[in-house]
């Protein structure tokens, strides 16, 4: 018998200034939902209502997951998603320069550097790719 995995809203993951939860996970995956996210799509910001407009369509992001039995669920790496965000902010900053964009670029660059350092540490300790701390 196949069990259906149920997505649940994550109430504290909202996009400012909206109060509407638009991100869901499957919290019973053994990682509290850290590998698959379902997101409600947005059509932009409504300046009259001072909030984002969300529609009844979703997209799913699956992160790579090594399971306890050694099997792997293919998916994105966190760094790939961060690189996409960094590329997007840099390109938008070319068209609409902003000090806030520069702060985002700095933050994403710091995140990627921390990822690199963590990977280097795990490689040096011989645990990269293993389910070990």
Regions found by a protein language model. Name each.
Residues 23-26, 55, 61, 72, ...:
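Weak global preference for isoleucine
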Residues 26-28, 48-52, 70, 97, ...:
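Generic structural signal for short, flexible, solvent-exposed coil/loop and linker residues
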Residues 1-48:
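Short, charged/polar N-terminal "headpieces" of proteins
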Residues 86-129:
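Short, compact, well-ordered microdomains
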């Amino acid at each position: 018998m196949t069990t259906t995995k149920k997505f649940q809203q994550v109430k504290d993951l909202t996009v400012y200034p909206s109060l509407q939860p638009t991100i869901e996970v499957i919290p019973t995956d053994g990682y509290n939902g850290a590998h698959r996210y379902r997101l409600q799509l947005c059509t932009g910001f409504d300046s009259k209502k001072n909030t984002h407009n969300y529609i009844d369509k979703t997209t799913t992001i699956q992160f790579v997951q090594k399971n306890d039995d050694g099997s792997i669920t293919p998916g994105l790496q966190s760094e790939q998603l961060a690189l996409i965000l960094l590329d997007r902010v840099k390109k938008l900053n070319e068209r609409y320069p902003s000090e806030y964009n520069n702060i985002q670029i700095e933050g994403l660059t710091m995140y990627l550097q921390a990822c690199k350092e963590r990977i280097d540490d795990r490689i040096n300790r011989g645990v990269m790719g293993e389910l070990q701390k």
